[in-house]
Structures are given as structure tokens and as C-alpha cells.
Amino acid sequence: MEAADSATNNSKDTHFYGKSRAENRRRSDAMLLLFRALTFSFSLAAVVVMGTNRYRINPQLKVSWYDFEPYRYVLAVNAIICIYSFVETWLAVYTYLQGSYLLPEIFQVWFDYGHDQGFAYLLFSANSAGVAMAQLLQSGNTLIHGAYHCTEAGGYCTQARVSIALGFVAFLFLALSSLLTGLRVARWYLR
């Protein structure tokens, strides 16, 4: 009887910590879905905050996000990340609910990993450019329309910094997604 029980236990496909491969994959899919949804949420918030960043300095003059190229870069990249993470969130929901990939596995694994890496670098680059511009405006080394400091532009500089901070949080979750998809690539080759 004991031999039969041990044979049954040995035939189970278990992974570290007593979890089966299916349980680990489902947990990994759930974490990836969470990271993708958070990336989408924070990048969307960054787009909305930067896109609504307009203030009147005086009755004839207003300052907006499109007056500075780094802020245009921040908005454009966050919009791209927002669209990408929305599509990837949809794919993660499909994978989580169906238990299989929409595309052939090797293609989707490499597609996700490559795009996560590329877009993470792009997002970090855009937010870094935005930080540099925000620091120049805050220090007074660069003036708004060549004559005005941040203090004269209402909450313009603060709102730009909030948008950049939201972009960095989106980068954090995109980097975590990239880590999980990198593990999927490694697992695919280690089978």
C-alpha cells in the first residue's frame, strides 16, 4: 500500500514549495495581469495630468505642456505606453481566463519580453528628459516664455512634476512586467 502511495505522489508534477506548474503559471499570469493593469492606469494618469497642464500667466499669455519639447516627449511616450499596456492587459486577461496564449507561445513570449524591454527604456528616457526640464524651470535657469519663473505660472511646474512621477511609477510596473516576461522566456528554453 505504501509503495502505491509513494508512486502516486512521485507521479505528481510538483514544483518548488509544493506548487504544481499549473498553479505557478496561474499565479504568474495573475501577477502579470496586475502589473499590466497598473502600468496602464499610471500611464493613463500621466497622460491626463500632462495633457491638462495649462495655466494663464497673465490675460494675454498662457503656458502649456506643448511649449517645452521634453514635456511633449513625456506625453507622447506615456500615450504610447498607455496604448501598449492596454493591449497587453487585454492579452493578459485572455491568458489568465483561457489558460493559454492567444498567439503561438514562442512568438508571444518573445513579443512580450522584447516590447516590455524596449518600452521600459523609452519610458525611462522620456521621464528623465522631463525631470531635467522640470529642474531647469524650477531653478530659474530656463524661464517660461523667456521671462517668467515657475512661481508666476500657478501650478504649472507642480503639475508637470506630478505627471513625470506618475510616469516613473508606470515605468516601475512595466519593469516588473518585463522581469516576469523575461522569466517566461527563460522557462520556455529550460523545458
Curated annotation (Swiss-Prot):
It comes from the Eukaryota. Pfam families: CASP_dom. Residues 51-72, 138-161 are extracellular. The chain crosses the membrane at residues 30-50, 73-93, 117-137, 162-182. Residues 1-29, 94-116, 183-191 are cytoplasmic. It is a multi-pass membrane protein. It is found in: Cell membrane. InterPro entries: CASP/CASPL (IPR006459), CASP_dom (IPR006702). Keywords: Cell membrane, Membrane, Transmembrane, Transmembrane helix. Belongs to the Casparian strip membrane proteins (CASP) family. Homodimer and heterodimers. This is CASP-like protein 4C2. It comes from Physcomitrium patens.
